[in-house]
């Protein structure tokens, strides 16, 4: 085991502080609408230019090992906030630094770090409860657009596109972000349920120009079995043919005699039919087939359920208003399943999302939920260069997370004002005499930092701006974009409550841990070994040569 270096007490905490300050300062310059860009060197390719706090934080490593530990702890604050709320990473970093700096002054003056931690925890609980009281639910497209705009660093186009996407697919809908080929940022919406399986044979196509099959008001046969013998299908096909409606067959596979017979009947015009493979694999396939059955009001043909293909009637088949099938995808629009059955299925999937510990499973469950609820939207991000594309795509993803957070827990005034208003609740907080009170005072002071830093980045005196905000009431604060004092809610300067809450909780958690640190252990840097053996005789002067 390599030898270790150990730092103790105040020396250890001061090393942490230097690391925290280094990282926090690089991140804090990006805060607010007048925040500056940070240019990050890459080992290959062009540098990255960003105004995203977590992107900056992830790139920072400090040479001194003890200082680097402090920097990495604050980086964790930014990452955790980004993962949970999607935004607020810079605010969380600024708060973590403020809480640690203010706390360290008191520890150096002889106050008990454990009591300070208890005071910080009590104060944060009260502030979080007050933020929830200040919170208002989002009302319509306008609020969502404003949250998206602020999170995307003031880009109204991004805010409006996200609001439009959420309006079309609903708050449970899937919204994905992809790179566009051109300069324009556009929105594509797929309504209904879409799964990534196309027709089994191009002979099923009804529109040769677009190479797609469109079935109007069709029946849908859903089975998890392979269909190869035609005899199993004949009874139900005869019933469908008599009705004059089209038929979509969703099966593990349709092959051999069955596929050939279906194609011949389609070409002759006897039966308007199309076959597609079932989506997914294994148990996930079974669940997706049940989703399709629930959405369309049909039954899944499965022997374990006692339903056989040859015994099917049209009552067992699903129905939909329209189905479009191309080479790669099948889209079911307006399935005719019972509303209460669909709601029960949605509730079941939501419960599974809550219970699962796997990120992959959660993502797949959310996709299934979105397909049942409303649809999928794709935001295609356009830009002139690859560097701009990366930066813009990251902003769109941040804005998307922030708008989801706003819909989930509501909104509060932005610009750091919500924290300053929530401070009123600390006046009523009863804390035992002693160092816990100083812990509460640390939080009181730290909560001024976000508003102060936003003002400083806009070229104003932070202390003066905070004083003027404190003189105002409710949502009255400093709009750094227009550099005026006004009602921030009316001006559209709002933050998701979840973002403000998560940023404070994560910052307080890490700052408390750092304040109660008494020792640090790091590996000693390895001494460089002696240079390789001496050169050959007669080679003097080699080290003066130019290469």
From Swiss-Prot:
Q: Supply the EC number(s).
A: 5.6.1.7
Q: Point to the regions of Gly residues compositional bias.
A: 531-541
Q: Name one GO molecular function term.
A: ATP-dependent protein folding chaperone
Specify which residues bind ATP according to the UniProt entry for this protein: 30-33, 51, 87-91, 415, 479-481, 495
> What residue range is the signal peptide?
none
- Pfam short name (any one): Cpn60_TCP1
Per the record, the major location class is: cytoplasm
Extract one GO BP annotation from the record.
protein refolding
In which compartments does the protein localize?
A: Cytoplasm
State the Gene3D superfamilies in the record.
GroEL (3.50.7.10), GroEL-like equatorial domain (1.10.560.10), TCP-1-like chaperonin intermediate domain (3.30.260.10)
Gene Ontology CC, one term: cytoplasm
Q: Where is this region: Disordered?
A: 525-547
Q: What class of enzyme is it?
A: isomerase
- Tell me the InterPro entries matching this sequence: Chaperonin_Cpn60_CS (IPR018370), Cpn60/GroEL (IPR001844), Cpn60/GroEL/TCP-1 (IPR002423), GroEL-like_apical_dom_sf (IPR027409), GROEL-like_equatorial_sf (IPR027413), TCP-1-like_intermed_sf (IPR027410)
Q: Which reaction does it catalyse?
A: ATP + H2O + a folded polypeptide = ADP + phosphate + an unfolded polypeptide
| Assigned keywords, A-Z | ATP-binding, Chaperone, Cytoplasm, Isomerase, Nucleotide-binding
Can you tell which superkingdom this protein's organism belongs to? Bacteria
Write down the NCBIfam families for this protein, in alphabetical order.
Answer: GroEL (TIGR02348), PRK00013.1 (NF000592), PRK12849.1 (NF009487), PRK12850.1 (NF009488), PRK12851.1 (NF009489)
Q: What is the annotated quaternary arrangement, including any partners?
A: Forms a cylinder of 14 subunits composed of two heptameric rings stacked back-to-back. Interacts with the co-chaperonin GroES.
Q: Which HAMAP family match?
A: CH60
Functionally, this protein is described as follows: Together with its co-chaperonin GroES, plays an essential role in assisting protein folding. The GroEL-GroES system forms a nano-cage that allows encapsulation of the non-native substrate proteins and provides a physical environment optimized to promote and accelerate protein folding.
Query: What's this protein's family per the entry?
Result: Belongs to the chaperonin (HSP60) family.
PANTHER family (UniProt xref) = 60 KDA HEAT SHOCK PROTEIN, MITOCHONDRIAL (PTHR45633)
Q: What is this protein called?
A: Chaperonin GroEL 1
């Amino acid at each position: 085991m390599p030898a270790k270096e150990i730092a103790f007490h105040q020396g250890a905490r001061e090393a942490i502080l230097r690391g925290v300050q280094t990282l926090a300062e690089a991140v804090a310059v990006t805060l607010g609408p007048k925040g500056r860009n940070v240019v990050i060197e890459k080992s290959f390719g062009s540098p990255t230019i960003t105004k995203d706090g977590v992107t900056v934080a992830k790139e920072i490593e400090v040479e001194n090992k003890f200082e680097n530990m402090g920097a990495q702890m604050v980086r964790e604050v930014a990452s955790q906030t980004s993962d949970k709320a999607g935004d607020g990473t810079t605010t969380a970093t600024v708060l973590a630094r403020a809480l640690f700096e203010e706390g360290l002054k008191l520890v150096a003056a002889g106050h008990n770090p454990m009591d300070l931690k208890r005071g910080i925890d009590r104060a944060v609980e009260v502030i979080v409860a007050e933020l929830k009281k200040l919170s208002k639910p989002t009302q319509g497209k306008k609020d969502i657009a404003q949250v998206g705009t602020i999170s995307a660093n003031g880009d109204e186009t991004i805010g409006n596109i996200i609001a439009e996407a959420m309006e079309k697919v609903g708050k449970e809908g899937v919204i994905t972000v992809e790179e566009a080929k051109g300069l324009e940022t556009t929105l594509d919406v797929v309504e209904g349920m879409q799964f990534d399986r196309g027709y089994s044979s191009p002979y099923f196509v009804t529109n040769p120009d677009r190479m797609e099959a469109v079935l109007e008001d069709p029946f849908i046969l859903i089975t998890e079995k392979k269909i190869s013998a035609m005899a199993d299908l004949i009874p139900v096909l005869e019933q469908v043919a008599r009705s004059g409606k089209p038929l979509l067959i969703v099966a593990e596979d349709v092959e051999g005699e069955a596929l050939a017979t279906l194609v011949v009947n389609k070409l002759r015009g006897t039966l308007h039919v199309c076959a597609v493979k079932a989506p997914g694999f294994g148990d996930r396939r079974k669940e997706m087939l049940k989703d399709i059955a629930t959405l369309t009001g049909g039954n899944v043909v499965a022997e374990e359920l006692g339903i056989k293909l040859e015994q099917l009637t049209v009552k067992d088949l699903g129905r939909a208003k329209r189905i479009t099938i191309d080479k790669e995808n099948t889209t079911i629009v307006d399935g005719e399943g019972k509303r209460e059955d669909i709601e029960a299925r949605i509730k079941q999937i939501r419960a599974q999302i809550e219970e699962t510990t796997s990120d992959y499973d959660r993502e797949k469950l959310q996709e299934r939920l979105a397909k049942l609820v409303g649809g999928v939207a794709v935001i295609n991000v356009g830009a002139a260069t690859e560097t701009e594309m990366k930066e813009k795509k990251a902003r769109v993803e941040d804005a998307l997370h922030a708008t989801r957070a706003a819909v989930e827990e509501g909104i509060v005034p932005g610009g750091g004002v919500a924290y300053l208003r929530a401070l009123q609740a600390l006046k009523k907080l009863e804390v035992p005499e002693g160092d816990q009170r100083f812990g509460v005072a640390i939080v009181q002071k730290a909560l001024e930092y976000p508003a102060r830093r936003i003002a400083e980045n806009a070229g104003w005196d932070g202390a003066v701006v905070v004083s003027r905000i404190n003189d105002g009431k409710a949502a009255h604060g400093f709009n750094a974009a227009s550099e005026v004092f006004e009602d921030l809610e009316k001006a559209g300067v709002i933050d998701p409550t979840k973002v403000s809450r998560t940023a404070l909780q994560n910052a307080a958690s890490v700052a408390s841990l750092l304040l109660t640190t008494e020792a640090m252990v790091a590996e000693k840097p390895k001494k460089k070994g002696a240079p390789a053996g001496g050169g050959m005789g007669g080679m003097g002067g080699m080290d003066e040569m130019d290469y």
